[in-house]
């Protein structure tokens, strides 16, 4: 979840590294550091600072350093607190080796203990520093650097990406990758290194993604690539256009606010894209037509917001194309009893395509030679490269940690895919698929209009009132329950207000004890008459206990509106698309609450955008 950026070449490194880190700060912002080799004597020059990247930039302004070979790091803490000592780079005893690292070294305690017995002195609590000390020892005991690296990689366990500078090899950088992304941008007599190619925007479109379990020795004009056992690997360079401009705020106060308003166009773009690949969709997602037609079970796997999108999509696949569908949290899926089924497909959902738990679940299913599909927003991601096939959401770059437009485009893509599968199975005709596409365009308009229907001053006034509460309860039934889960997560993520979500039918099985006037209860309504009446009954129970009720209702649902302290009314649309229609207003309301509380909305505490460690 940390950001790594490096440079080696004809120019000085600091400007590129700092610009790159600013683009990758979403990966972590507990501390930051920069190191380079002094062009005069090849000694390390470095600065580290706890807190946001701005603190490091300030230190570098006060104490300028630079060199032609340099690297930087923005950290999300997994081992050790946010402090100058724990910030990267980390060094060996003699400060001849510097390392920046993303991931987790699972056996770092054993390595540290062994090296301490041998006389090594450690200065941090990180799992990174032991790598530098171990490499120091191995270089001394091997005749070649390559042999030392192979020995190092045989000794460390976990998932990691590392960039390493060595004073005695001052014209190159060592890169190591195991189950954590790392790539090289190839320039003219210069090389750019990053954990996300977003850092390369405006510099190069020639990109080499390090294969899993590989290491590279990189000079300004040469790349030597090897597997962990020292066998040379081919250089598979891709041409990828990266546009950083779409990631700018463009006048909005926060990235999250911009991305909320991006959703209409993102859904429009999704429909245009999905229409364009409709005739070749099964090639795209790695299924044969025959397999798609005979599909008997679908499994959806994701984490966080992507898991909520999967929970919503379960209703699509079961009701539209009549395929039994299971949904699993990726972090739990790998440890469950598993029964492979051949006429099945596994869809892995991740905005970044780098989510560690989801990737490991994908690799587990790949190892069983079952059909895997990646649904992601990033075409250059690891999931795209490793799945049998993929489907790209058309959200555009999402910068805010709290997902907005990635969530809505995931729902749109899965809704369309369910209809396309139903067409393949002969359950619907092409006209019905086209109607579903039009329905998505309609709901995109509703999503945006629902925000405008509640003028900003009204929402701001309501946000000021609801920001005073310390906790909240969210309820839903059927397809509105997973949407309630997402709403509760959004409130927790960006406002830090404690929020708990339950299926409304479970209210009497414990949660009713939490109801009081100081705990607002949010209910997300449903179009089905039976489910709606059950929600009305839940609302009555809450009011009978002096609960404060906020309802997201549909036009004409007067009975539940009459019970509410606050109502948000949505137009009636296709029942399965109600959660998507409610998405924009829900996000905007929660955003305003967080703004009222003066929270760092784009970068909430303790969270990172791309969760690349388990």
Located regions from the model:
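Conserved short alpha-helical segments that host acidic/polar catalytic motifs at enzyme active sites
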Residues: 1-249, 253, 265-296, 335, ...
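Glycine-rich oxoanion-binding loops at beta->alpha junctions
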Residues: 68-85, 270-289, 313-349, 355, ...
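Acidic/histidine-rich
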Residues: 159-190, 466-493, 529-531, 536
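Active-site phosphate/pyrophosphate-binding segments
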Residues: 263-299, 389-520, 531, 597-614
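Glycine-rich phosphate-binding loops that contact phosphosugars or nucleotide phosphates
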Residues: 293-442, 477, 524-571, 589, ...
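Generic C-terminus detector
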Residues: 548, 563, 573-614
């Amino acid at each position: 979840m940390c950001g790594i950026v490096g440079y080696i070449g004809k120019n000085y490194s600091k400007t590129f590294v700092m610009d790159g880190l600013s683009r990758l700060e979403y990966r972590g912002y507990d501390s930051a550091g920069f190191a380079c080799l002094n062009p005069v004597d090849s000694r390390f020059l470095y600065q580290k600072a706890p807190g946001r990247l701005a603190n490091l930039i300030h230190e570098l302004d006060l104490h300028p350093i630079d060199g032609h070979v340099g690297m930087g790091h923005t950290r999300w803490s997994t081992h050790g607190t946010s402090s100058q000592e724990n910030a990267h780079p980390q060094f060996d005893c003699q400060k001849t080796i510097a390392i920046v690292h993303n991931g987790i070294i699972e056996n770092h305690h054993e390595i540290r203990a062994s090296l301490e017995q041998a006389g090594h002195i450690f200065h941090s609590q990180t799992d990174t520093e032991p790598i530098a000390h171990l490499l120091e020892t191995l270089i001394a005991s091997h005749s070649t650097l390559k042999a030392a690296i192979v020995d190092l990689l045989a000794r460390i366990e976990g998932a990691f990406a590392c960039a390493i500078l060595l004073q005695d090899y001052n014209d190159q950088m060592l890169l190591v990758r195991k189950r954590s992304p790392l790539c090289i941008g190839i320039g003219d007599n210069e090389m750019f290194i990053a954990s996300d190619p977003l850092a390369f925007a405006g510099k190069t479109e020639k990109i080499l993604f390090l294969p899993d379990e590989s290491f590279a020795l990189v000079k300004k004009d040469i790349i030597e690539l090897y597997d962990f056992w020292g066998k040379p690997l081919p250089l598979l360079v891709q041409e990828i256009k990266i546009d950083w401009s779409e990631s700018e705020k463009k006048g909005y106060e926060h990235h999250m606010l911009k991305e909320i308003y991006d959703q209409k166009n993102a859904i429009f773009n999704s429909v245009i894209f999905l229409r364009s690949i409709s005739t070749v969709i099964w090639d795209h997602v790695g299924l044969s037509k025959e397999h798609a037609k005979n599909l008997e079970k679908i499994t959806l796997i994701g984490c966080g917001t992507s898991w909520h999108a999967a929970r919503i999509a379960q209703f699509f696949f079961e009701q539209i194309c009549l395929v039994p569908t299971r949904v699993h949290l990726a972090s739990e899926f790998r440890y469950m009893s598993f029964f492979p089924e051949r006429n099945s497909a596994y869809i892995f959902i991740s905005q970044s395509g780098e989510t560690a738990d989801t990737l490991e679940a994908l690799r587990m299913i790949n190892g069983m030679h079952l059909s895997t599909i990646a649904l992601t927003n990033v075409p250059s991601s690891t999931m795209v490269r490793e799945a049998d096939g993929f489907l790209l959401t058309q959200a555009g770059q999402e910068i805010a940690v709290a997902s907005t437009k990635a969530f809505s485009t995931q729902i749109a893509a899965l809704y369309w895919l369910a209809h396309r599968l139903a067409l393949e199975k002969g359950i619907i005709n092409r006209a019905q698929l086209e109607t579903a596409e039009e329905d998505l365009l309609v709901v995109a308009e509703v999503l945006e209009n629902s925000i405008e229907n509640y003028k900003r001053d009204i929402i701001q006034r309501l946000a000021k009132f609801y920001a005073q509460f310390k906790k909240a309860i969210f309820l839903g039934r059927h397809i509105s329950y997973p949407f309630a889960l997402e709403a509760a997560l959004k409130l927790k993520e960006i406002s830090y207000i404690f929020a708990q979500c339950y299926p409304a039918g479970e209210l009497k099985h414990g949660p009713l004890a939490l109801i009081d006037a100081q705990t607002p209860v949010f209910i997300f309504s449903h179009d089905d008459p039976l489910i709606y009446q059950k929600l009305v009954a839940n609302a009555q129970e809450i009011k009978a206990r002096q609960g404060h009720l906020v309802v997201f209702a549909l036009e004409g649902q007067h009975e539940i509106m009459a019970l509410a302290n606050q109502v948000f009314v949505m137009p009636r649309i296709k029942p399965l698309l109600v959660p998507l229609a409610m998405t924009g207003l829900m996000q905007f309301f929660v955003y305003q609450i967080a703004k009222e509380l003066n929270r760092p909305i784009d970068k909430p505490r303790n969270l990172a955008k791309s969760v690349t460690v388990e």
